[in-house]
Amino acid sequence: MTKQATNAVLKKGQRFPLTIKRLGINGEGVGYFKRHVVFVPGALPGEEVVVEVTDVKPRFAEASIRKIRKSSPDRISPPCPVYDQCGGCQLQHLSYEATLKEKREIVKQAFERHTTLRADTLTILPTIGMEDPWAYRNKSQLQLKTEKGQVKAGLYVMNTHKLVDLSSCLVQHDATNEASEVVKQIVQDLQIPTYNERKRTGILRSVVSRVGFETGELQVILVTTKKDFPKKDLLVEEIKSRLPHVKSLQQNINPKKTSLIMGDETISLFGEETIEETLGDISFSLSARAFFQLNPKQTVKLYNEVKRAAALTGKEKVIDAYCGVGTIGLWLADQAREVRGMDVIAEAIEDAKENAKRQGITNVQYEVGKAEKIIPSWVRSSWIPDVIVVDPPRTGCDDQLLKTIKQTKPKRIVYVSCNPSTLAKDVEQLQRSGYKVKNIQPVDMFPWTAQVESCTLLVYEGK
């Protein structure tokens, strides 16, 4: 439908009743007005609402709730005082039990929309949730901003320059909440300039804190625009004094005009360069920029699903693509003949090697680089993988990697996904090359958000 036709039907400011049919991939309610898709943040399936159009796009419209005529029985009051402003969570107004069902439904809808597979023929298992879905995040990344002389540390409202000050967050571990609040107060006391995005002035951009759930070790990273600045030594001393349990204090320098949190250079200000975390029987060393799953308790459940899907017997050669600090590969190593992994972040690979060494795991090998370049070189040297595990970013697998996988033809692919849409699109390509989806296991890694993690098993059956 053309944009002109859409504008002829829907206008900004227009109000009308709407029945919500389902949840969208971003957690918004989805309804249809004269065959036009309308996204309504905060609305739930089955609800009858009166909405006001806030924006009209070529293929859909966005609207806000003006009145709820018929409320969902699954609607609850959000416990977070800044839930409507922050945007970090999208589903605190939906009961947790219902959230788990909806996340499975989001996966199903993604396959209906992006594949030729019939969703009713797929084995999509019930979502694995948490017993206590609060205080689960081990890492906090808050932007710093000074307004009317007051230093704020928080998150930006989506698509705006408004920063919501977060003195505490219900989904963050208490240690990260404390660290962020203490650093914010020190910056206020010392009057250190925070970064001004518009003027590109100031020093401190962000405070990042990470805690080991099992070890209790705390890491604080100060993201700055330059390496040296006034009162830097005093800032370090104050953090050491007010956060005496901090094990690792790092500085990351990011001088660029970018939405990315961290830059390329990290230096140690105090203590160790890494902190330790334990998953199951395996301990991991985490540097400032290293990726590590944000919910350790659910990570163990997810990785056990990966191990179950891989179905290793001790004879298989396994590739851990997008390996990060080696978490998945090391989890599988005791049941594999050999595990090889790669990642584009050099520090992550160094951590992966160190993690393997510390565990005494000798049947693993890690390289810096892109999977789509490294895997063919292994194949050329007659090292053919039996199982490939992929855990890509939200954008999904690189097209060249998918091409490489299809050429390599491993017996099994275990696809760990954080985005049902890109998962479905990638699966569509793989199933055309002879792979069959055996099952999809959603895992709720981020309670109260719209994000859905999943573990999908694909088996090569030939064309």
Swiss-Prot record:
Gene Ontology terms for molecular function: 4 iron, 4 sulfur cluster binding; metal ion binding; rRNA (uridine-C5-)-methyltransferase activity
Enzyme class at the top of the EC tree: transferase
Q: Which InterPro entries would you find in this protein's record? A: MeTrfase_TrmA_AS, NA-bd_OB-fold, SAM-dependent_MTases_sf, TRAM_dom, U5_MeTrfase_fam
Annotated residues that bind S-adenosyl-L-methionine are located at 293, 322, 343, 391
Pfam families assigned: TRAM (PF01938), tRNA_U5-meth_tr (PF05958)
Transit peptide: is it a keyword of this entry? no
**The keyword Protein transport belongs to this UniProt entry's keyword annotation:** no
Catalytic machinery residues: 418
According to the entry, every stretch annotated as the TRAM domain falls at: 9-67
In the record, biological process GO terms are: rRNA base methylation
PANTHER family with a match to the protein in the record: PTHR11061:SF45, RNA M5U METHYLTRANSFERASE
Q: Which family does it belong to?
A: Belongs to the class I-like SAM-binding methyltransferase superfamily. RNA M5U methyltransferase family.
User: In its UniProt entry, what is this protein called?
Assistant: Uncharacterized RNA methyltransferase BH0897
Per the UniProt entry, what species is this protein from, by scientific name? Answer: Halalkalibacterium halodurans (strain ATCC BAA-125 / DSM 18197 / FERM 7344 / JCM 9153 / C-125) (Bacillus halodurans)
Q: What is the lineage of its organism?
A: Bacteria, Bacillati, Bacillota, Bacilli, Bacillales
